[in-house]
Amino acid sequence: TGANMAGKSTFLRSLGVNYILAMAGMPVFADQLKISRFRLFSSMRTTDDLTHGISYFNAELIRLEELLKFCKESAEGEFCKESIAGNKVSLRTLIILDEILKGTNSLDKLNGSRKFLEAIAKQPVSGIIATHDLELSKMENDASGKFHNYCFEIDLGTDVTYTYKIQKGVARNQNATFLLNKILEKY
């Protein structure tokens, strides 16, 4: 979680880029990086396609369905390997999602996001998901250790101070109304 412009999306992109660089044996943008082998799936910048009749929300649903198929392939398909003992071992999926279901109303977004995260938690995945929806942070208490909350906090005074540092917990401060009020004060 975190306020607008606090660094959530930039962190997700940095994580994805560094993961790909590391898996390719290239230098990464970090002092140190320790990773495991995953199949990577990201959804960062969903766009509509009006020429094909696909609204923004529909594009989001299509992408989430692609993620579910991707996870199933990792668990059951060609990416599922046989171990020395003869057991099937799934190659886990690393998911990076930025603000899912933002193309719908607040209540549907919350309920749909919760339902999707409950479904994805049953898959062999690890992931990082950015959200403004603080209600979703309650899933940390409900999902037997499957979810953990981290945030990018800001300090609100006469202005906004961005720390750009990730920390354990849920963001306490939000800045959208604060920033809008700054604009409205000018007029």
Feature-to-residue mapping (PLM):
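ATPase nucleotide-binding head domains, primarily ABC-like/P-loop NTPase cores
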Residues: 1-187
